[in-house]
């Protein structure tokens, strides 16, 4: 009976890892879009680049990476100089990452 519980929990964990990897890939793509957009202020593009590097660091736990990026992006989403389209993308990223953190 204990073996069944262990197998079931490992399947759940593997599914969670795949889901977080898919989410990180989607978020990374959005961040690259922000980084390449010249209408976005340089400080926001730098924050997007830093966030992308953190997301792609396999040495950290996925929840730690998600929480760190949420913190960075939450700060820049309140920047008065961020264009509306970039703010909307940041909010989309925050929404995606909140699902991993929980």
Swiss-Prot record:
Pfam family, one: UPF0147
Matching InterPro entries: Ta0600-like_sf (IPR023130), UPF0147 (IPR005354)
Domain of life the protein comes from: Archaea
Segments traversing the membrane: none
HAMAP family reported for this sequence: UPF0147
Family per record: Belongs to the UPF0147 family.
Official protein name in the record: UPF0147 protein MTH_1407
